[in-house]
Each structure stands twice: as C-alpha cells, then as structure tokens.
Amino acid sequence: MTLRQDYSHNLFSNQLKNRMKKLLLAALVAFLPFSAIAESNLDKILSAGILKVGTTGDWDPMTMKDPATNKYKGFDIDVMNELAKDMGVKVEFVPAEWKTIVSGITSARYDISTSVTKTPKRAEVAGFTDTYYKYGTVPLVLKKNLKKFSTWNSLNNSKVTIATTLGTSQEEKAKEFFPK
C-alpha cells in the first residue's frame, strides 16, 4: 500500500468512524420509543460509567474475538471504543448471538449492538440509526460449479444445500429466495 493509499484509507476510515459515533450516540438517546425512557437509559450508562455493547465476535472485519487474547477486535469494536471514550465511560463487550441480538437490547443485557441488519420484525421492538455500512449478499459457489449455478433460480433446488448463519437476516433471505 502506498503512502497516499494508506492516508486515503485512514482518512476515510476516520470519517466513517466519526459519522458512526454520532449516529450511535443519537441511537442511545433515542433507542426506546419514549424519550424520557431513552434519556434515563443514557443517564444509566453515564452514571454507571459503562457502555455495554452486544457483539457476536464472528464477523470479520467488523467484530472478531481473538482466541489468543480473548479480546474483541475489528471496525465496530474500534468505533465502540471511541464512542465510549467520547462519552467518558468504559466499554464492556458482551458476548451475543445473531439469533438473540435484538432480545439482548430489549432485555437490557447490553445497551447497544452494531452491524445489525434492520428488518421489519426487528424494527418492531428496537431502534436503528442510519446505515453506516452497506454490503450486499450474494450466493457463493465453488468456481468449478459456476456454469451449473449461474442464476439464483438454479440454486432453488431441493438437491442444493444453502448454508447461512442461524438467526441472521441472511437466513431469512435464504428461506425467501430458496424455498426448495
């Protein structure tokens, strides 16, 4: 990587992190439907001095748990550390699973989570900020099978096994697009 590429990457990364911190701080204040409750949630975080963040630790490069150190690392982890620093509190990463990521918020197991896909079902019970990272989901097949599986419809076959992570929005989409 050239110096210019490194600078551009760091500049973009810092701008994105700053934008995300603002969005997430706003989410902490407005996470619950009633502003008084949301404000008390923020007050609770500030008075306890701890921001509890639910994270799965299984989605590189956003959140990964390093088995050597047993600590989390990744883009979302960096942003949450910066957000906590800006708030003047410590951050505590709480292990979470995709299938229960939203219930961890609604049960107050943690205060916030990141990189959670907004779905209508999740939006019924949880608040979401604006998107800070967009990605697409596409089927992945072995290169030698590209001709055999050249369309999405060619994958919708009872003899084809589709694998996803349980509890994710990708699981929902796989069931929708590949019902066979």
Task: Kindly give the residue locations of the regions a language model identified.
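Positively charged n-region of N-terminal signal peptides that target proteins for export
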Residues: 17-23
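Sec/Tat signal peptide C-region and signal peptidase I cleavage site
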Residues: 19, 32-38
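Sec-dependent N-terminal signal peptides
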Residues: 23-32
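Extracytoplasmic small-molecule ligand-binding "clamshell" domains
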Residues: 40-116, 124
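Residues embedded in well-ordered beta-strands
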Residues: 52, 138-140
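Ligand-binding cleft/hinge of the Venus flytrap
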Residues: 63-69, 80-89, 151-156, 169-180
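Ligand-binding "clamshell"
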Residues: 67, 121-135, 179
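Flexible hinge/capping segments at coil-to-helix
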Residues: 143-160
